[in-house]
Amino acid sequence: MYAATLPPDPDNAALLYYQAFLLRPDPDAETSASIDKVIRGGEPDEKLREYLNLSDCRETIEFAEAAAQLPYCNWGIRFSQGLGARLPQLEHFRPLRFLLYADARVLAMDGDYHAALNRCLTIRRIASHVGDDTMLNYVVSTDIDGSALRYIQNILGSMLPDAEILTWLRGQLASVQGAVLSPARVLEMDLELIMQSMRNDPNDLLWLREQLVEDNEGKSAEYFWNMTDEELLALITEPYADFLDYALGVIDSEMPYEEKYVELQRLTDKFKEEFSNIPGTNQLAIAFAPQIIEIYSLQVRYTAQFNALKSAIGIYLVTANTGRLPDTLPDYLPKDPFSGQDFEYEFTEDGFILRCRAKDIYWTSHTLWPPNTPPDVLARSIVYEYEYKIQSNTESN
């Protein structure tokens, strides 16, 4: 007797995401404007609903949802290409997340807030799958997750506080993995990709040997010419690897934000000064060492946004149970990572604001202001605040 046996569905989420990318229909100009309006806070219109009801749109969402539920995701990155490895999938996540959020906004408008928030959680899962295999993956992953947190913030502001949904959401945020917080793996992978790029270019290795022979005063020319390629790479990269170890130790320490930032800056300046004249290592010192502070700052900004959202859910829960905003922050809410203290809590006409108590040192010093910017603007510190809205049947002081 014949018994059909179908092979199982793919267990690699990337295969489903790639199909979602191919299925997603390109919106026309009018629909693109509708999507952009929703992303900027506007309401969904009929043109957007028509687009979302297309069969290819529904299947795109279904494939993305199925992919996001899988634990394993391998994008097929050709790591052997080093820093030249192509990442064509990354450009597709922006329109995909916009599509998912547009659908979430329609669901919220129709009163299905649970499903709307689930769409946003799918975007968080996608951020986790984008991963930290390369520096670009890490940055895109964090950006996607930050968008998901903003989208959740917007959905919460469109609904009446509901204790059941809020309790469920709080649990989901604790269990659903978003972007990888620790920069350790991506920084170590970055170094490995740098080394692989050098391996791939014999002319680059030849130039490095010639420069070391020419510039080194303590070793003979034969010492460098007799080195294997791997020994040469180790000589060039070991100082940077040691620097990474020290820097990651600082990031993982219990030091407060400002002390960590100052120490990372000191380590970076010291490394650049010590190795700026050593061929090969000087390229790492100039091009890659400064990104430690950039990545750490990105991590802290993301943590502030995530902690603010979790704190806001605590406030919404009190509001759902009492019918009014609490006078002060509930106990045991996450802290502002810039200051290590509770967020500042301020009432507004239609909700509340959570504000960090200390500035973002990196962006305060690196913001590029246009010419003729007033001095009082130039003197401002970058301090983040997060505004949350409450629907009108609640009250505040």
Question: What is the role of each PLM region?
Answer:
Residues 1-397:
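Short acidic linear motifs
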